[in-house]
């Protein structure tokens, strides 16, 4: 079952979820009067609050209801659409095309030609080979694609035997003072799993499970985002300060605090760049660049966000439609003339670029969830909705009431329910109904 068919079977009015492109996207859209900016901002903030509280239905469908919109394609604000799409990905595990957004940058024709002629090697093997030569590995993500977080867990598993035992995550909500941050991370280790207060993106069950399983492996968590950035005055200055502050915090809290340990750093796309990003004018140094300078360590930098099926930072060329043919069955690293190839936003700014296989659905769920150690399990019949739509959530029975679900699926009364993908162990269930 393809993504569009999955959403159609669930009765949702969504925009197309095919490859990203700069060309106009044809889709059925009901014209609606656009809300005021104040109304949009209020709905956006409420959606964030609902997601942090685990109210996924309110954060997604409720967002549309507050704006008096019948379907997501009526959203004209790209940031509000991204917020809606992020919450939906927490329930479906797949990203959604944003029709309110144009291409962010142009890809030089030479890069497209190189991509068409590229070869590929298995990603984990190449990452492990190169990770032996350094003490720091930096892996990025597309914030709207949970697939990236599942691959991050694969990388964490593969690197652990090499001595990698510190996991620094940009999304972790820490503290400005180092002592307070250390205490907060110790509490996280004691819990063994993330709570909603752990950070903004941990409402995604896949991200929360990546952290849970990494802690179980013995990784020590580190948070390092300390700057509340004000982009209103000068965005480039603000971004540069944020990148430097991140690198300084990582130097103190990871590199210096654990001098004999190796470190895996998990970041948003831009921060992995070791050189200013040419596609954006090259005017701002990124965290990886600063950390390389201050630590004296040349990190292995890996981009998996740029070749996502629906990248957050959108090129004017559908790069994934070319690259996915290089990775029919497993995640691969691109090569050209015997050297790693990088294209798109981070071309020339990272060491490796990963492309993942095209989405395959099994019982309505992405097959890559199996790589997280999940077992397919039909939804108990007693939990299926008699009418309307219902979010069916699975929690580890031992987790508290404020835990993040280990899995969840959206089901409708008039269609087959996707199966749950569950870890081993006792499970308790919860439901959220769409009014």
Predicted region positions:
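Bacterial N-terminal signal peptides
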Residues: 8-16
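Sec-dependent signal peptide recognition
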Residues: 2-8
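Compositional signal for N-terminal targeting/processing segments
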Residues: 19-435
